[in-house]
Amino acid sequence: MHILTPTQAPLVPNPPHELMYTSSPLQISLPDFRRLCIFKGIYPPREPRNKKKVSKGSTAATTFYYTKDIQYLLHEPLLAKFREHKAVAKKIGRALGRGESGDASRLEKNLMPKVKLDHIIKERYPTFVDALRDLDDALSMLFLFANLPSSDHIPAKTIALCQRLTREFEHYVITSHSLRKSFLSIKGIYYQATIQGQDILWLVPYRFVQRTGGDIDFRIMGTFVEFYTTLLGFVNYRLYTSIGLVYPPKFNARSDEQGGELAAFQLEGKATATNGASNGHAEDAEINPEAQAIADRIGAMPDVEEEEATTAVAKTGAEDDEEEANEEIDKFEPTAPDADILPQPQASSAEVASLFAPFTFYLSRETPRGSLEFILKAFGCKRVGWDGVLGDGAFTTNESDPAITHQIVDRPALSNGAPASNVQETENGGAAAPKAQWPYSMMPGRTYVQPQWVWDSINQGKLLRADHYSPGADLPPHLSPWVKPKKGEYDPNLPLAAQQPEGEAEAFEDEGDEETAFDVDGDEDMEAIVDREGSVEVGEGMDVADDSEDDSDDDESDEEDGPAGDEDDLDSDAESDISEGEAARLQHQRELEAEATGKKLEVKKPTRKEENATIRKKAEKKKRAEEEERERQKMMLSNKKRKLLKRIEYGENKRDNESENLRRKRARVEKAKAAAEAV
């Protein structure tokens, strides 16, 4: 494999002054070459095996490219644009050198070539599905730049373009109800949408004050942003036209200046402008392309055929309603505890899309308004209100509005969350609506939840219990919806008893009792031992032995106890069997004595500790038998497979130990919580 650099010379991060690129077959500079490679999707391959031979003995940092990639770039039309740009830059430089700033600005305005990437988008993505598959990185990059502050490296024009494109994409997701899952992580908020059968996952950073460091190459990132903005513009146009909407949507600059964000865009259908009922926007009204096509056909038909067409449409709608009514989701339940768990069928997209449709939400000032508004509207909610200081576009800014059913808060209540009682009289003498101001008062009949309730509800596809997410409550764990727990791993969603192996609960209980007894009685027992009558402390009438004598005694005791300890370990199974047999024999003997004397046998009820010990012994015996059987099976394997199995068992044992530690920690926390509630 012959490998060639674009300049017939090694490419280094900081090329020396004497390295000339004019002899390059592409006739462009190194920054332009890297920019062109990003546009065309050409990336350096891995280092070749014969790196020393290809580098001709050079040890400098070198980037290699395939010869076919360089030949592929020779026919790129952008090369002419780069050369024109270089020529105009020289003219502008000469004008500035002569002090003719007016001529320089005129040259920059009139002669500077515009680089268009439309042909590259069509070349890299022959089909629309290909563009959707490559949309993850584009959305993550554009959402990142949309939340960055403007600076010398990032012009405000680029940030405004990223904000416009990303909000247009969010409007499509809201209108089509394509959002499926979301997750709050340390990096930001992950979103997953399903568009035309393709799962698209992107990351949106939290809205904090971003501080960019000096070690970031904004020139490379700006090149990616330039390409991704063109790509997302193509994708948005195709998505909008596929559902019968006009692209680009109308933009209200005044609303955007007032913090409207999504509210600054107004969607319109191709036939007539649509104004939604909530927040005055058209994202609430969906346009079905199939229904629009049928309506267009009906309008072109003669009057005689209109009745038949209308009847056909009504019949089709009735059949669809009947199919939706008969839809039932089958649940696959495991037949045995160790059986494979089949993936459960998901609820219909229509049900999930209207998850929050019946409710009216109000967002408190401390909650993330942008992400909550996007998620709530994407899942059917048409009425979202917030305080006026958060921006324009709210359904209502009155927190005391009686139409509000849910209020999302992110701080505990003050004054014990007392209901709103300051009822005032109106001018006509009637009672006015009470004024509710969280966290000082609560509105009767309104549900107060924390923001995590929204994320957990959409990830599970159903409305969860609101009392588990009440203000100030300990929230359940927020888990990633894309990571499914494997068999044997700890699952925080399941109850502890459902994932504990046999005998583990009893062992945890005994450990907890021993720790409690030691903590409570430890000091008292020690004082009783030290202060007992007749005790002699060190220095009171006795000699202290030398360290050497103590060491020798300890060594002798260790030598004497060593073999005995080994024998105890080896004969533990036999002792457990003997103890069980001895207990049965003693019980039988007591029964015979009671029968001979005519007395009633007193049945001694075992204590909780004895029951736990019995269950634990049975579990240990069963586990020991399984391990012995496994060892016998491993003896039949070859040495190679035995080593492979050993590595597998190492990973399984490590995972089991981690799961056991987590279960032990959870058992300790639940026990402490139960004790606190009992008190």
From Swiss-Prot:
Subcellular location: Nucleus, Nucleolus; Nucleus, Nucleoplasm
Biased composition (Basic and acidic residues): 582-614, 623-634, 646-662, 669-679
One GO term describing the cellular component: PeBoW complex
Record region (Disordered): 413-437, 480-679
UniProt feature coiled coil, ranges: 573-679
InterPro entries per record: BRCT_dom (IPR001357), BRCT_dom_sf (IPR036420), PES (IPR010613)
Keywords: Coiled coil, Nucleus, Ribosome biogenesis, rRNA processing
SUPFAM superfamilies: BRCT domain (SSF52113)
Function of the protein: Component of the NOP7 complex, which is required for maturation of the 25S and 5.8S ribosomal RNAs and formation of the 60S ribosome.
Subunit structure: Component of the NOP7 complex, composed of erb1, nop7 and ytm1. The complex is held together by erb1, which interacts with nop7 via its N-terminal domain and with ytm1 via a high-affinity interaction between the seven-bladed beta-propeller domains of the 2 proteins. The NOP7 complex associates with the 66S pre-ribosome.
Name of protein: Pescadillo homolog
Species in which this protein is naturally found: Pyrenophora tritici-repentis (strain Pt-1C-BFP)
